[in-house]
From Swiss-Prot:
The gene is pheS. This is Phenylalanine--tRNA ligase alpha subunit. Its cofactor is Mg(2+). Binds 2 magnesium ions per tetramer. One of its GO terms (biological process) is phenylalanyl-tRNA aminoacylation. The keyword Lyase does not apply. PROSITE patterns: AA_TRNA_LIGASE_II. Its main location: cytoplasm. It catalyses: tRNA(Phe) + L-phenylalanine + ATP = L-phenylalanyl-tRNA(Phe) + AMP + diphosphate + H(+). Tetramer of two alpha and two beta subunits. Keywords: Aminoacyl-tRNA synthetase, ATP-binding, Cytoplasm, Ligase, Magnesium, Metal-binding, Nucleotide-binding, Protein biosynthesis.
Length: 342
């Protein structure tokens, strides 16, 4: 009986080994495992015959059966690894990727029209040697008003025009404080522009509580109003892509003397008169002037030795003129249908 069991064990091992070699896929290999090692498999059935063996033969035959199971399991495991590798290679071959094909483009946004205007302004002035400087949006009264020769009784310092904090600080109403801080830190001559957000208590079709402004400043021994006029004429020709007539009107600003407001020929009607320019043929775009001596004194610059000019204009206003936008609020409503046009 013992010899018969040994022959059966060897026969089953040979059958299993041959079947494993012939297996071509994982499903077939799994079926072989069930046929030989499963609950009703050939080796499991063979173990049931141990009851008919003598007490001396049982442990020997039982050990041989377990060795056979381990051997078959090892062959199946090795074959499984081989088949999985072949399966992966076949899948990769069927799903070949052409790495030379262009990738899929992600959906991208576009620059806001005000940002585009800011970049155009920065590009122009940086080519002329102007530094682009920035400063805090929360300011003190000194930098926002006093150093700019704006007295305490000036309307701009009233609560209804300026956003104040409880500690006396405020949201800057212009980017001029950046110029004051720069003049404190640098020695003339220098030239700079200061773009940024500013805040005022105002909201209608042409005004928002927050808007974008850029101011320019030049301090030198030979600064003249004529030089400023020439610069502005060249800037607007660059910005709008054509020569535009400019008109300087006398005005008043506490921080400049003399002061002027600058109008450009209406970009919609070429100066003929339309609704955009209220039929005047002109559009107001900025204020400017020669830096007031008191402003220079406040930052320890001798007004007898150095002179300067300054200007300030709204970037939102320029964006409206450049792109033909008739309502300022459209720039701040985050309407993607509108913004994607730019």
């Amino acid at each position: 009986m013992g010899r018969t069991m040994l022959v059966l064990i060897n026969t089953i091992q040979e059958q299993a080994s041959e079947a494993i070699k012939q297996a071509t896929d994982i499903v077939a290999l799994e079926q072989i495992r069930v046929d030989f090692l499963g609950k009703k498999g050939k080796l499991t059935e063979l173990l049931k015959g141990l009851a008919n063996l003598s007490a001396e033969e049982k442990p020997k035959v039982g050990q041989l059966v377990n060795q056979a199971k381990q051997g078959i399991s090892a062959l199946i495991e090795t074959k499984m690894i081989e088949l999985k590798e072949k399966q992966l290679l076949a899948k990769l071959a069927a799903e070949q990727i052409d790495v030379t094909l262009p990738g899929r483009n992600h959906s991208t946004g576009s620059l806001h029209p005000v940002t585009q205007v800011k970049h155009r302004i920065n590009d122009y002035f940086s080519r002329l040697g102007f530094d682009i400087v920035e400063g805090p949006e929360i300011e003190t009264e000194f930098y926002n008003f006093e150093a700019l020769n704006i007295p305490g009784h000036h309307p701009a310092r009233a609560m209804h025009d300026t956003f104040y904090f409880g500690d006396g600080r405020l949201l800057r109403t212009h980017t001029s404080p950046v110029q004051i801080r720069t003049m404190e830190q640098r020695k003339p001559p220098f030239r700079l522009i200061a773009p940024g957000r500013v805040y005022r208590c105002d909201s209608d079709v042409t005004h928002t509580p927050m808007f974008h402004q850029v101011e320019g400043l030049l301090i030198d021994k030979q600064a003249t109003l004529a030089g400023l006029k020439g610069l502005l004429q060249d800037f607007f020709a660059y910005f709008f892509g054509r020569e535009l007539a400019l008109r300087f009107r006398p005005s008043y600003f506490p921080f400049t003397e003399p002061s002027a407001e600058v109008d450009i020929e209406c970009t919609q009607c070429n100066g003929k008169g339309c609704r955009s320019c209220k039929f005047t043929g002109w559009l107001e775009v900025l204020g400017c002037g020669m830096v007031h001596p008191n402003v220079l004194i406040a930052v320890n610059i001798d007004p007898n030795e150095y002179h300067g000019w300054a200007f300030g204009m709204g970037m939102d206003r320029l964006a409206m003129l450049y792109y033909g936008i008739d309502d300022l609020r459209m720039l701040f409503e985050n309407d993607l249908t509108f913004l994607r046009q730019f």
